[in-house]
C-alpha cells in the first residue's frame, strides 16, 4: 500500500457519493430547503462538485478550472466562486441558474480531469507545497476576505493534505448534511427559511 493509492480511493469515493445523490434526488428537491438557515439541497451538491474542481485545478496547479470553460461559465454564477464563504442569496441564485443534470455532467468532466492529473502523481509529488494563495490571485472573488477565510488554513500545506481535506473530509461532511436535510424534507419537516 502507498499513500497515493489511499488518496485515489478517497477521491473516487467522493465522486461516487456526489453522483449517487445527484442521480437519486428529484428535480423538485434540487431547489428545496429542508430547514431554516440551511442551504438548498442543490447548492450542497454543486458546491461539492466545485470544491473538487477548485482544489485540483486552481489551488494545487494554478490552472483554469473546468468551471472556467465557456459552457460552464454560462451556467455557473462567477460571483459564487466555488461556493465557500459566499452570501446565502448568491448560493440560492446558483441553484436557480443550473440543475442536477448539468451539475452531474460537470462532475463527470471534473472526475475525468482529476483522474488524468492524479495518474501522474506520486507520494513524492504530493508532498510538494503548492503556492495556493498565489494561485488564487488572478481569480475575481477568490481572495475576498469571506471566501479566503474558508480555505486560508490550507495555505502552506502539502498537496496531499489539501486534497484529503476539501476533496475528502469536507465532501463527507457535506454528504452527511445533505442526507439529514433530504431525510427531513422527505419526512415532511420542511419549513420556510427564516
Indicate where each model-derived feature is located.
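N-terminal export signals and maturation junctions of secreted/periplasmic proteins
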Residues: 1-9
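Short, contiguous alpha-helical
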Residues: 8-12, 30-85, 112-115, 119, ...
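Amphipathic alpha-helical packing segments from all-alpha helical-bundle domains
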Residues: 18-21, 110
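Short, contiguous, well-structured surface segments enriched in hydrophobic/aromatic residues
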Residues: 24-25
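Phosphate/pyrophosphate-binding loop motifs in nucleotide- or prenyl diphosphate-using proteins
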Residues: 85, 89-93
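A short, structured beta-strand-centered segment in the mid-to-C-terminal lobe
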Residues: 93-106
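Vicinal oxygen chelate
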Residues: 107, 112-114, 123
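A Lys/Arg-rich helix-loop hairpin that forms a DNA/phosphate-binding surface
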Residues: 126-127
Amino acid at each position: 500500500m502507498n499513500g497515493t493509492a489511499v488518496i485515489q480511493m478517497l477521491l473516487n469515493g467522493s465522486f461516487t457519493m456526489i453522483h449517487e445523490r445527484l442521480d437519486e434526488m428529484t428535480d423538485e428537491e434540487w431547489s428545496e430547503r429542508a430547514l431554516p438557515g440551511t442551504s438548498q439541497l442543490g447548492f450542497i451538491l454543486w458546491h461539492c462538485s466545485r470544491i473538487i474542481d477548485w482544489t485540483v485545478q486552481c489551488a494545487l496547479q494554478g490552472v483554469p478550472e473546468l468551471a472556467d470553460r465557456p459552457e460552464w461559465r454560462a451556467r455557473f454564477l462567477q460571483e459564487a466562486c466555488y461556493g465557500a464563504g459566499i452570501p446565502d442569496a448568491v448560493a440560492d441564485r446558483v441553484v436557480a441558474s443550473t440543475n442536477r443534470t448539468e451539475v452531474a455532467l460537470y462532475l463527470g468532466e471534473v472526475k475525468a480531469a482529476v483522474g488524468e492529473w492524479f495518474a501522474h502523481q506520486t507520494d513524492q509529488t504530493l508532498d510538494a507545497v503548492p503556492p495556493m494563495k498565489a494561485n488564487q490571485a488572478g481569480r475575481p472573488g477568490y481572495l475576498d476576505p469571506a471566501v479566503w477565510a474558508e480555505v486560508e488554513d490550507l495555505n502552506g500545506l502539502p498537496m496531499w493534505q489539501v486534497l484529503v481535506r476539501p476533496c475528502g473530509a469536507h465532501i463527507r461532511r457535506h454528504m452527511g448534511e445533505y442526507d439529514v436535510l433530504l431525510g427531513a424534507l422527505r419526512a415532511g419537516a420542511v419549513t420556510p427559511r427564516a
